[in-house]
Structure formats: structure tokens, C-alpha cells
UniProtKB/Swiss-Prot annotation:
Catalytic activity, as annotated: 5-(methylsulfanyl)-D-ribulose 1-phosphate = 5-methylsulfanyl-2,3-dioxopentyl phosphate + H2O
EC number annotated for this UniProt entry: 4.2.1.109
Pathway where this protein functions: Amino-acid biosynthesis; L-methionine biosynthesis via salvage pathway; L-methionine from S-methyl-5-thio-alpha-D-ribose 1-phosphate: step 2/6
Annotated localization: Cytoplasm
GO annotation, biological process: L-methionine salvage from methylthioadenosine
Name of the gene encoding the protein in the UniProt record: MDE1
GO molecular function list: methylthioribulose 1-phosphate dehydratase activity; zinc ion binding
Active site: 154 (proton donor/acceptor)
Compositional bias of kind Basic and acidic residues: 16-26
Taxonomic path: Eukaryota, Fungi, Dikarya, Ascomycota, Pezizomycotina
Protein name: Methylthioribulose-1-phosphate dehydratase
Length: 260
């Protein structure tokens, strides 16, 4: 095997570790990422090469590249790095790639994806530029708020209770998603994302003001379904705001009386 390639994020390098992204299994990360991104493109989540996704398979991390049209992505476009080698890197901005495509640049989302893997042991992290997510951050900006909070909505059940906790949130629970401010360069968001993770240990997502959202999960299924649920709630919240409806309500639980 060719030794790992070490370089700065902007560096393009090539090696012969193409076997890492070659598989007939549709569930292989190198096949899943293009498939997922093509679906996300139809939803408007990764328009104009924005957004991306990353999947961790044990120590191997598979990443969508920068600058690629997400609906046209191929397995051969995928970067692969070693999580352990990255943790041992002397520089947080230095990457240890096992496999690099010859054309594209590594995604600036990479350190944010790595934060989800190292701090939450996530199996997948998704970054979208959903306009519903952006609109929610603008509404919160007007309110001077750094949290998205909503309760008493059925779709809240689509979220886990938190890191290393079993079960999902309930209908009457309050979903809380922190908001961090955007930066001129994506990589510079990393420390603020990590701070939000520390402050909100149970969150599965972080909103980025005027930018989008990062969502992660224990595996691809959970990350995808939580991202879908969150986008549903963002759209609902924007439309509720237009109708003058509150996101937080005090509703008495309905208790069934039948005993059979």
C-alpha cells in the first residue's frame, strides 16, 4: 500500500489507493456519499457545489470533495483519510490522506466533520445550505437569539435524546439547536462548532448563521433522517412565524381514559 499522503487542505495529491473507493456494494461509503448528495441536491440542500457529507467507517473517513457539482459526484471523487493519523497530526489544518482524487480540492468542511466523529463518535455528518435553515437563523438574528427551540410537534420524535443516551425525544419535549456565527472561511467555524458541542452535549446539529446547518448521527440512517426531520421543522417554523404562531407552546398532555 502506498504510504499516507500528508498535505495542507488546499493541496492536490494523488496515490494508487483507489481500491479504497472501489466497491460493488451500494452501502459502501464511497458509493453512498454520491448517492446521498444527489438526493440532497434535489432538495436544494447542496446547490451550486455547496454543502457536503462525510461517512466514518471505523478509522477510515470518506469525504466529498470541494467544488464538485454534488448531483454529478462519482465514487472516484471521494477523499479518504485516517482518523487516527489525523488525531496525531501536529497541525489541526494538516490532513493525512490515504487517498486523494487527482482533480479536486479537499472540502473546507473536513475539520467540522472530524469534530462530529471525534467528539460525538458519529458515523456520518451532513452539511446543507438549506434555505429553510438559513431563514431560521435570520429570524433568530432579529430576535437576538442563539438557539432554535420548538416543542409540541410530532416530528421532534425523529431526534435522539442525546449523546450516549437511549431513546428519542417525545412529542412534548423541546428540541434545542444552537446557532453559531458564520465566518469568512469554513474551516474557521471549527472551534465555534466544537464549543457549541461542549455547551449543548445532547444536540445532534448546529446551525450556522446565514449559512446552513451541520447534522450528525451514529450512522448514515440516523444522520439522514435527523437532517430530514430538522429541515421539516425549519420549514414549519418559518411558516409558523409568517402566521404569527409561536414555536414554544404550553399544551396539557392528553391522557387516554380507556383501560382496554
Amino acid at each position: 500500500m502506498t504510504p499516507p499522503t500528508t498535505g495542507l487542505p488546499a493541496e492536490n495529491t494523488t496515490d494508487d489507493n483507489d481500491h479504497l473507493v472501489q466497491s460493488d456494494d451500494p452501502e459502501h461509503p464511497a458509493n453512498l456519499i454520491p448517492s446521498l448528495c444527489a438526493k440532497f441536491w434535489t432538495l436544494g440542500w447542496v446547490t451550486g457545489t455547496g454543502g457536503g457529507a462525510s461517512i466514518r467507517d471505523d478509522d477510515l473517513v470518506y469525504l466529498a470533495p470541494s467544488g464538485v457539482q454534488k448531483e454529478l459526484m462519482k465514487p472516484s471523487d471521494i477523499y479518504v483519510l485516517s482518523l487516527a493519523a489525523q488525531a496525531q497530526s501536529l497541525s489541526r489544518r494538516q490532513r493525512v490522506y490515504l487517498r486523494s482524487p487527482p482533480v479536486y480540492k479537499p472540502s473546507q468542511c473536513t475539520p467540522l466533520f472530524l469534530a462530529a466523529f471525534t467528539k460525538r463518535n458519529a458515523g456520518c455528518c451532513i452539511h446543507t445550505h438549506s434555505h429553510w435553515a438559513v431563514l431560521v437563523t435570520l429570524i433568530l438574528e432579529q430576535q437576538g437569539s442563539k438557539e432554535f427551540r420548538i416543542n409540541n410537534i410530532e416530528q421532534i420524535k425523529g431526534f435522539g435524546k442525546g449523546f450516549q443516551k437511549s431513546g428519542n425525544l417525545g412529542y412534548h419535549d423541546t428540541l434545542v439547536i444552537p446557532v453559531i456565527e458564520n465566518t469568512a472561511h469554513e474551516e474557521d467555524l471549527t472551534e465555534f462548532l466544537e464549543e457549541a458541542m461542549d455547551k449543548y452535549p445532547d444536540t445532534y446539529a448546529v446551525l450556522v448563521r446565514r449559512h446552513g446547518v451541520y447534522v450528525w448521527g451514529d450512522n448514515v440512517h440516523k444522520a439522514k433522517t435527523q437532517c430530514e426531520s430538522l429541515d421539516y421543522l425549519f420549514q414549519l417554523a418559518v411558516e409558523m412565524k409568517q402566521l404569527g404562531l409561536p414555536w414554544i407552546t404550553d399544551i396539557e398532555p392528553t391522557i387516554p381514559t380507556r383501560k382496554d
